[in-house]
């Protein structure tokens, strides 16, 4: 053992434990609270169940659309020799740093009744605000970067020689993508989809502006907090944390069974490497 490493490691462990407590203690305090059975009863109320249904339906719809649209975009950004490539990738990152409420304003300006896209649609009685479509648009805006960025990293980690070998054997670009690139990059893509679903499920700010009604679970939680205080908001918060924890746990289990224990979750190695 190299001299000096142990004290440094202990110092880093101490500093890291402070951060870990800050991250984990609030969640554990919620999950282990003695009133959780009362919160489950509150969640079983019709208004809570409706908000939960809207959240699950919208977040799952958003993830499907992010997979269908975001993964191909990531493949192009990872493999194509595009001009100003760094600029296009930087654009993908922008929604991650734009405040949620500001993102909602931008979406409303674009897709609202007077927006450049919303106005022509509104004249045809197609509305993109205050409905499920508005919720999905808001969720995609804030969560899609997780899918795209993870997928870019996943596709970039696939050995280009494998794609070249498939091309020399006569495979089309579509077959190379479907039979070589996508399977090898899938663990990293799955990590991005998992994070995106959790992010979409908990989205509040942009949804508040784009589609206050129907209430998603985060908005319902805010309404209950405004009317009943902390006690009224805790059941919805408990439900969201349980769903997020379950999603991460399922992702870790799937990674173990598929042989990618270190990469299907957001905690490990680069995509495309097995055990």
Map each language-model feature to its residues.
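Membrane-water interface segments at the C-terminal ends of transmembrane alpha-helices
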Residues: 2-37, 46-156, 180, 184-200, ...
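Short coil/turn motifs that cap or connect alpha-helices
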Residues: 83, 171-173
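Helix-turn-helix DNA-binding elements, focusing on the entry/boundary residues of the two helices
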Residues: 162, 204
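The alpha-helix within a helix-turn-helix
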Residues: 166
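Glycine/proline-centered hinge or cleavage motifs at structural transition points of membrane proteins
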Residues: 169-170, 183
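Extracytoplasmic catalytic/substrate-binding loops of multi-pass membrane glycan-assembly enzymes
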Residues: 214-216
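Short, Lys/Arg-enriched, Gly/Pro-containing loop segments at transmembrane-helix junctions
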Residues: 258-267
